[in-house]
Amino acid sequence: MKVGIVGSGMVGSATAYALALLGVAREVVLVDLDRKLAQAHAEDILHATPFAHPVWVRAGSYGDLEGARAVVLAAGVAQRPGETRLQLLDRNAQVFAQVVPRVLEAAPEAVLLVATNPVDVMTQVAYRLSGLPPGRVVGSGTILDTARFRALLAEYLRVAPQSVHAYVLGEHGDSEVLVWSSAQVGGVPLLEFAEARGRALSPEDRARIDEGVRRAAYRIIEGKGATYYGIGAGLARLVRAILTDEKGVYTVSAFTPEVEGVLEVSLSLPRILGAGGVEGTVYPSLSPEEREALRRSAEILKEAAFALGF
């Protein structure tokens, strides 16, 4: 099975590396305007495969994407320190206007997996440019924010993060919504579990975890210029869900006809992900405050996409 990655920067190359380590695909093709960069990353990652799985990693052109089951769109300009994801819009929308048609010319049956920030709006841009059914254009959305939320809760409660079930919805960015009301640990409501564990969550604890999730990307960007390992692993996990027709539930971004009264917006909700992309949405139980926060997040994304004409 072939996977394409358009954009061989930090996110694209980290995704290719994660795919190779996980053995998700048989072939990974890196496409980039900077052919030398794509070739260098491909060769370096290929040299890691003897220690992992037999994956053929190579650089190529758009034509080499033919037959790809999934294509990761990681092309674009990097987020600058202090820059919000929504401020990236004008620059990255222009990139997608060139990239999306060329990808679909070579791989018309592929699921498009959008990684370029601001990912929710770029998912909407890719969807409008592609003419594909909504489920075939999937954004990485809040998969990383959800992972951060679960990891911080697990750290506080001293349990494995795999036992924590909690979601971050809406924008992958400043207006994201941490869903505390329906969070569970081992099937037990979060607050009940925390009390039983002797680790009751005070308002200060919740505020600290919220800040830890919401500001993580900014701290990392300030320290080293970009985030890529976490999202690379997350994207590889989404690719595996597509290639294996897993039908797992992930907080990914997709075009949504209506959410909390806001029409035609791309944002993250728990989605069932399989071979055809998004196959359904699992709308979680939300408190009134969370519903209002999700509505505001949807409005922000809707306005940003509308300003671009998408």
UniProtKB/Swiss-Prot annotation:
GO terms for molecular function: L-lactate dehydrogenase activity. It catalyses: (S)-lactate + NAD(+) = pyruvate + NADH + H(+). The keyword Nuclease does not apply. NAD(+) binds at M10, V11, D32, Y62, G76, V77, A115, T116, N117, S140. It is found in: Cytoplasm. The active site is at H172 (proton acceptor). The modification Phosphotyrosine is found at Y218. Its EC number is 1.1.1.27. Keywords: Allosteric enzyme, Cytoplasm, NAD, Oxidoreductase, Phosphoprotein. The keyword Phosphoprotein applies. Optimum temperature is close to 90 degrees Celsius. Allosterically activated by fructose 1,6-bisphosphate (FBP). GO terms for biological process: glycolytic process; lactate metabolic process. Homotetramer. HAMAP family: Lactate_dehydrog. This is L-lactate dehydrogenase. It comes from Thermus thermophilus (strain ATCC 27634 / DSM 579 / HB8). The gene is ldh.
